[in-house]
Amino acid sequence: MSDARTSRIELNVTTDENKVPTSIRWSAGDAGIANAEAKAFALSVWNGREALSIDLWDKDMTVDEMKVFVCQSMMTLADALERATQDERAAGAIRGFTSELAERIGVGPAAE
């Protein structure tokens, strides 16, 4: 008998008449998250050959918020790479680049 189970992560996007997102909500039952509000999401999946992605943000998200979101997302990708591969050097390179980018675009330590 198998102990396999299925987990569900759900994203709900409300759009205006022009199909621009006005509200993003998400749930992840296993994490205890139900109908939580989000301003943006970046979903990437790997089909064995290429990464496919869906990136959405609500119409009220500011340019500065998007810059922070992108830099934070890049840092979490570095963390995921390190956990999956134990390649500290590659993850460190991503973190270094991201830190430099954050400073250059005004959302890093030099901007504070």
Located regions from the model:
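C-terminal charged interaction modules
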Residues: 79-112
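Active-site- and interface-proximal helix/loop "cap" or "latch" segments in soluble metabolic
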Residues: 4, 22-86, 90
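Structured beta-strand/loop patches that form or line metal/cofactor-binding pockets in enzymes
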Residues: 1-13
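Acidic surface patches and DE-rich sequence motifs
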Residues: 16
